[in-house]
Structure formats: structure tokens, C-alpha cells
């Protein structure tokens, strides 16, 4: 059966009920095989409102006793009852609640957060108790003003004197009510005047009904208390006994109302930013790892996607609705010179359903001459509907017609590269060129096509009618290939099968090959995707290294800020509060690095694009890169955060 949660702020003691009861308390420490007992069977009872001084020399066990009284440490044996409730059964979070709602600590070394202002230091217990921001700001200001520090609420501890820092510590102890003030050598680091002021404050708080437990080695300081308990070698050697209160205990607990999780996150984020500002150079180096990782992912994927888009566009420009029939059986060498395709095959293919155009092609390397200029290029003998099939219009003039083919006209259409080489700065339309010393009249110039994905200049070409070319230019009867344009691209595979069956029936043997441009695009896209993934993986490794850097720095931060963690635990921070704080610090680093990395990655890609490198931006890589950076912070920040949350309060407070 689950025990009902104990709430010290919701409980009150009767006039005759002890506030604290210790019975047979011992505390031992083990170092290897050696066990040292510091406390021996401590019996102690403290009632509400008492001003108790525990006095003893160094090593007497008084600080260990204070740690147990303040629930910073657990006894090795014995019973500790707080308001009748056995503290031994409390878990870490319940002990944190007890410290938060019942105890206020005043330390000899002040134990203030160096990067926070006086007001922010005072507010720490209220942050963990869930007091709304406006209310805790007002209460902190009121407490500081009552202690004479109203004008120094925004000063950091380094800007305050020792006495002022101790008053800030007292104000912090009172923030959540300060039902019990545990003061460990509160005057030890102060001059005599400041020490007297602190003791005056403690006597005043005692008069107001606060229970004061003073730990000191100085007899003259202890004399200011109502009850002096002497401890020596872990034993209580003198105790006049408790004084029962004459009336009910005052209510010290301020109004606390749980704030939303969003408010907790905002406060944790503010604390994280303050911690990062405290070590700007180190934070910048940590950010750099994430920035490089995110920027690399975005830039490399943009380059990979750009290269893929360029290749696909180039292939698409050749026609996505095309089938190319070539002579020669599959895997046959030298199929370019194999004589299997004839013009009758072209006419038969044109009769098939879903065929928009069936275009014969022959080619030969020729020399063109215009005036005194020679140009070595490729002559393509084809039909009048070549431009329709290839989706390649003329830029000027016209393409030859079916009538030109029928009458074996000696007309030519030049590619952009060829036209520019033969007729620089001159309109070639109507001019004559010699194709292997045969005069052809230029009737058109094709629009620019650019290079193929394999680097071949498609504009370095001359087109002539098929009939004329096969008779006077190539001297061939057989075709180099047949280009088949389909009407419905969704049925291109079915049309390919029909063309294959037709040619197989006509030839009686599979002496041809059919290439589907849509399949080529799919293959090239798959290859480019693989390369893009490879680039992204290499970049992701950079992000992984950045994440390891975050974990390394956070582990160092936990080590450096162990004392701060102890202070926060002493003021009531739960394990989840510490875990949340350091996890958010890692996430803030990763998120900032991710945002900067996105900007750097996009900027890098833009600069690379200036050098004619194809770049393609898309939202998905940006989201993935930032998401991975955030996830990296979460994953690699968890271990340091968990380490921080599991620290022992006493060990953490004792660290330097």
C-alpha cells in the first residue's frame, strides 16, 4: 500500500508535540575496508520556536548532525521523526520537499549562486516550490528590503560584502517561510560587527517564532541561544533539555500555488542561458560542433539534391515519354553497327496504339564548311517529326517537312553550337553549308539543348531529311535507332511490350534492344539518392561528433557546478528539477547551434551556387538537420543531467 505523501507545510504541531525527535542516531562512513563512526547514539528533541545552539570543536560531529537534521544526509541507524513522521521512509524527492517547505539553510560560506543577483538567489527555494513569478519577485524584494538590502537586490554576490551576502542567505532561508533555520557557523567568515548583526537577526527570527538551530564552535556565539547542546566525539555530552512552547506555532508558509510546466521550462531556460553566458568561449566552442554538423548536413544535401535535379532535368529534356529502339541483341558487343532495324520497322511501330511518333535516325560524323570555316560535327538523318518526338523546337526558321523528305531536299537544320561556329554573328537562315562537300541550304536553327548527363553537347549537330541523308550523307540502309514517342506516359511499359512483340514477330529473333527513358530516370534518381545519402551520412557524422562535444562539455559543467547543484538541492530542488535544468542547458546549446547551423548551411549552399554548382533547397533537410541537432542534445545531454540529478547533497555542497 502506497504511503500518503507527507506535507510539512500542511501540518502543524500542537503545543506539546516535538518538531524534531532523534533517537539512537548513528552515522558511519566507509573508506574501503575502514569504517569510521562519526555520531554515536544521538538522542535529541527540539520543540517549535526553540533557539538551540549545537556547539563543539572541529571533528566533533556537529556538521554531520546538522546535515541529518536538515535532511541533507541519512543516518546509518536510529530514528528521525519530523512532526511525528519517520523520515527514514522518505525517498529523495520527499526529503527535497521537506527541505523546501520546512528548512532554511544559512551557511558559513554563504553558498550563493555566483551568476545570479541577490534577488534571484533569494528566489531559488520559491522556484522549486512553484510560487508564481510575480509573487516570488515581490516576496524576495520585500525580504531583502526588510534586511536592509533593498537597493542591492540586483547586485551579484561578488558585488556584496560578507555581511550582506550572509543577509541574502538568511533572506533565502526565509523565502518559503523558514519554519526551521539551520545556521552552520553563520558568523565564521564575518568580522565581529557583521557577526553581531547576523546574530541579532537570528534572535529576532527566534522571537518571531522561528525554530533556530545554530551550529558553532564558538562558545560566546552559542551563549546567545536559549539552549546550548554540547557535542564531543560524536556524543552529546551536555543538554539542558528542551523547552516546550507556551502557545501554538506561527504559520510561516507563504502562499504556494503550483505553476504550469511551461513556467518551469521558462525558468529552467533562463537559468540555462545564464549558465551559458557565464562561460561564453566554451559555450561558443560547443555551439561550433553543432553548427558545423547541421550546416554540413544542409549544404551537402542541397548539393546532392541539386546534382540529382540537374541530371534528372537533363534526361527529362531528352523526353520522358520516349522509347529508344537500338539494333543488336542484349549484351551483344558492337551493336551500334549491327544491321537489324529498317525503315519498314518504323512504319510498323507508328501503327501501334499509344504511339505519338515513330522516328528513324541515322548518324555519321561529317565535316561542315561555310566559306572558309570547317566544323567537325554529327549529321543526324531523321524524319520531319523528330522535333515533336523529342520536344525540341527550332529557335529560328523551320524544321524540314514531310514534303522535303519526299522530294529528297538538300536542306539542313543546325544546332546552336554548330550555327555559332559556322556563322558567328550572322543569321545562318538561307545560307549554304557543305556537308561532306554536298551543298545544303540552312532552313532553321534548333533551340539550345545543352549537354547530356554524360557530357555530350547536344547542340553540336546538323539535321537533314532521312531520305536525303541515307542516300547522300550516311550511305546506310539500316537505322542507328528508332525513337518512339508515346501519348500516355502511364502506359509506356505496355507500349514497350507491344513494340517488342511487334519487332520479334517481324525479325523472328530478338536482335534489338528497347530503352525506356522513364526507367533511365528512375535508375539515375536511385543512384543520385544513394550518393545524396552518402553525403548526408558523412555530414551526420559531424553532427554526431558535435553531440559528443555537447556531452563532454556538459559533464565538465556538472563537475564544475557540483557546489551549485548542492545549493539547489539544499533549497529544495527535486531530482527532476536538476535533471530538467541540465537537460535544458544541453537542448539550448543544441537548439542555438541548430538555428545558427541552418543559417550557415543555407548561406554556404548559396555561396557554392555562385560557382555554377547546382543547388536545390528543400524544407525536409532543414527540418531533419535541426531535429537531429535537437535530438542530439536530448540524447547526449541526458547522461550528464542524470549524473547531476543523482549527486548526494552533502557531497555536492562540500565540493569546491
From Swiss-Prot:
Any one Gene Ontology cellular component term annotated for this protein: plasma membrane
Pfam families associated with the record: ABC_tran (PF00005), FtsX (PF02687), MacB_PCD (PF12704)
Membrane-spanning parts: 284-304, 531-551, 591-611, 619-639
Membrane topology of the entry: Multi-pass membrane protein
Alphabetized GO MF terms: ATP binding; ATP hydrolysis activity; transmembrane transporter activity
Gene Ontology biological-process entries: response to antibiotic
Subcellular location, principal: membrane
ABC transporter domain ranges (all copies): 20-258
Compartment list: Cell inner membrane
Positions bound to ATP: 56-63
E.C. no: 7.6.2.-
CDD domains linked to this entry: ABC_MJ0796_LolCDE_FtsE (cd03255)
InterPro entries: AAA+_ATPase, ABC3_permease_C, ABC_transporter-like_ATP-bd, ABC_transporter-like_CS, MacB-like_ATP-bd, MacB_PCD, Macrolide_Exporter_MacB, P-loop_NTPase
Domain of life: Bacteria
SUPFAM superfamilies documented for this protein: P-loop containing nucleoside triphosphate hydrolases
Keywords: Antibiotic resistance, ATP-binding, Cell inner membrane, Cell membrane, Membrane, Nucleotide-binding, Translocase, Transmembrane, Transmembrane helix, Transport
Assembly information from the UniProt record: Homodimer.
Sequence similarity: Belongs to the ABC transporter superfamily. Macrolide exporter (TC 3.A.1.122) family.
Protein purpose: Non-canonical ABC transporter that contains transmembrane domains (TMD), which form a pore in the inner membrane, and an ATP-binding domain (NBD), which is responsible for energy generation. Confers resistance against macrolides.
Protein name (Swiss-Prot/TrEMBL): Macrolide export ATP-binding/permease protein MacB
Gene: macB
Amino acid at each position: 500500500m502506497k504511503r500518503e505523501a507527507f506535507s510539512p507545510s500542511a501540518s502543524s504541531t500542537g503545543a506539546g508535540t516535538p518538531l524534531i525527535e532523534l533517537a539512537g542516531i548513528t552515522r558511519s562512513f566507509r573508506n574501503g575496508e575502514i569504517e569510521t563512526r562519526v555520531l554515536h547514539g544521538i538522542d535529541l528533541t527540539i520543540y517549535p520556536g526553540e533557539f538551540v545552539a549545537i556547539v563543539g570543536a572541529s571533528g566533533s560531529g556537529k556538521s554531520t548532525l546538522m546535515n541529518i537534521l536538515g535532511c541533507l544526509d541519512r543516518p546509518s541507524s536510529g530514528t528521525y521523526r519530523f512532526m511525528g513522521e519517520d523520515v527514514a521512509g522518505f525517498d529523495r524527492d520527499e526529503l527535497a520537499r521537506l527541505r523546501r517547505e520546512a528548512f532554511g539553510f544559512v551557511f558559513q560560506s554563504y553558498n550563493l549562486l555566483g551568476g545570479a543577483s541577490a534577488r534571484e538567489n533569494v528566489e531559488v527555494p520559491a522556484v522549486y516550490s512553484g510560487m508564481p513569478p510575480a509573487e516570488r519577485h515581490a516576496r524576495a524584494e520585500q525580504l531583502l528590503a526588510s534586511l536592509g538590502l533593498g537597493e542591492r537586490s540586483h547586485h551579484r554576490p561578488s558585488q556584496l560584502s560578507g555581511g550582506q551576502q550572509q543577509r541574502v542567505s538568511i533572506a533565502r532561508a526565509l523565502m518559503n517561510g523558514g519554519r526551521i533555520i539551520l545556521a552552520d557557523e553563520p558568523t565564521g567568515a564575518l568580522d565581529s560587527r557583521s557577526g553581531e548583526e547576523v546574530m541579532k537577526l537570528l534572535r529576532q527570527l527566534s522571537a518571531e517564532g522561528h525554530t533556530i538551530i545554530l551550529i558553532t564552535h564558538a562558545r560566546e556565539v552559542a551563549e546567545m541561544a536559549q539552549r546550548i547542546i554540547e557535542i564531543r566525539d560524536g556524543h552529546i555530552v551536555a543538554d539542558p533539555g528542551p523547552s516546550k512552547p507556551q502557545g501554538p506555532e506561527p504559520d510561516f508558509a507563504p502562499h504556494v500555488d503550483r505553476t504550469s510546466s511551461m513556467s518551469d521550462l521558462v525558468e529552467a531556460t533562463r537559468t540555462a542561458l545564464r549558465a551559458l553566458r557565464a562561460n561564453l568561449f566554451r559555450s561558443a566552442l560547443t555551439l561550433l560542433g553543432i553548427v558545423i554538423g547541421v550546416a554540413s548536413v544542409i549544404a551537402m544535401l542541397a548539393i546532392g539534391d541539386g546534382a540529382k535535379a540537374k541530371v534528372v532535368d537533363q534526361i527529362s529534356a531528352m523526353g520522358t515519354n520516349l522509347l529508344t529502339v537500338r539494333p543488336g541483341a542484349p549484351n551483344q558487343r558492337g551493336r551500334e553497327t549491327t544491321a537489324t532495324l529498317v525503315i519498314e520497322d518504323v512504319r510498323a511501330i507508328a501503327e501501334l496504339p499509344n504511339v505519338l511518333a515513330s522516328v528513324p535516325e541515322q548518324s555519321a560524323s561529317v565535316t561542315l564548311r561555310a566559306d572558309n570555316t570547317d566544323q567537325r560535327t554529327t549529321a543526324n538523318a531523321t524524319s520531319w517529326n523528330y522535333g515533336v518526338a523529342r520536344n525540341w523546337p527550332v529557335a529560328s526558321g523551320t524544321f524540314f517537312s514531310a514534303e522535303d523528305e519526299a522530294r529528297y531536299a538538300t536542306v539542313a537544320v543546325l544546332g546552336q553550337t554548330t550555327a555559332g561556329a559556322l556563322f558567328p554573328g550572322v543569321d545562318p537562315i538561307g545560307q549554304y553549308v557543305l556537308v561532306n562537300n554536298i551543298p545544303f541550304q540552312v532552313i532553321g536553327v534548333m533551340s539550345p539543348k545543352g549537354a547530356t548527363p554524360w557530357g555530350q553537347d547536344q547542340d553540336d549537330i546538323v539535321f537533314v531529311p532521312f531520305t536525303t541523308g541515307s542516300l547522300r550523307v550516311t550511305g546506310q540502309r539500316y537505322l542507328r535507332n528508332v525513337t518512339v514517342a508515346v501519348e500516355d506516359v502511364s502506359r509506356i511499359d505496355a507500349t514497350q511490350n507491344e513494340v517488342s512483340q511487334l519487332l520479334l514477330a517481324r525479325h523472328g529473333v530478338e536482335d534489338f534492344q528497347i530503352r525506356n527513358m522513364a526507367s533511365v530516370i528512375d535508375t539515375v534518381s536511385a543512384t543520385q539518392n544513394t550518393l545524396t545519402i552518402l553525403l548526408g551520412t558523412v555530414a551526420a557524422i559531424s553532427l554526431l561528433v558535435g553531440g559528443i562535444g555537447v556531452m563532454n562539455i556538459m559533464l565538465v559543467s556538472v563537475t564544475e557546478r557540483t557546489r551549485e547543484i548542492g545549493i539547489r538541492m539544499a533549497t529544495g530542488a527535486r531530482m527532476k528539477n536538476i535533471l530538467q535544468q541540465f537537460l535544458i542547458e544541453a537542448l539550448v546549446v543544441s537548439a542555438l547551434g541548430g538555428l545558427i547551423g541552418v543559417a550557415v548551411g543555407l548561406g554556404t549552399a548559396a555561396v557554392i551556387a555562385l560557382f555554377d554548382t547546382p543547388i536545390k533547397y528543400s524544407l525536409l533537410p532543414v527540418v531533419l538537420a535541426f531535429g537531429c541537432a535537437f535530438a542530439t542534445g536530448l540524447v547526449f545531454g541526458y547522461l550528464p543531467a542524470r549524473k547531476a540529478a543523482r549527486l548526494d547533497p552533502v557531497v555536492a555542497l562540500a565540493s569546491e
